[in-house]
């Protein structure tokens, strides 16, 4: 049932699925390509990055989507910082997010703080 809802055209449904801890990774993976508006897309990516059931494939897809948004000049900063807290992803992969033109000095600083806290 949750898998079929991921194909729904409504962003509030996508966000509800991404916030539901019982949503399976396959449905989460499908949500990584959902697009609506800048605000809704960035919120969805943050929710996916924070989801307790997100596996490596889901997190990798979120990472790729966030990188694309940064390259386009958008600011999915909350998703970047949420990804930085996920140990399933390599710190070097995440550190690259700070090199995009769309990142601010503050985001780079917070990203470095989160990644350095992971090492300890």
Cite the ranges covered by each PLM segment.
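Alpha-helical scaffold segments
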Residues: 1-120
């Amino acid at each position: 049932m949750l898998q079929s809802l991921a194909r729904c055209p409504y962003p509030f449904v996508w966000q509800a699925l991404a916030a539901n801890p019982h949503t399976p990774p396959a449905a989460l993976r499908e949500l990584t390509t959902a697009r609506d508006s800048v605000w809704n897309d960035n919120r969805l990516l943050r929710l996916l990055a924070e989801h307790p059931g997100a596996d490596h494939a889901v997190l990798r897809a979120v990472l790729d989507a966030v990188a694309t948004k940064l390259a386009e000049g958008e600011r999915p900063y909350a998703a970047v910082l949420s990804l930085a807290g996920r140990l399933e992803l390599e710190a070097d992969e995440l550190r690259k997010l700070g090199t995009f033109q769309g990142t601010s000095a503050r985001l780079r600083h917070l990203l470095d703080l989160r990644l350095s806290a992971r090492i300890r």
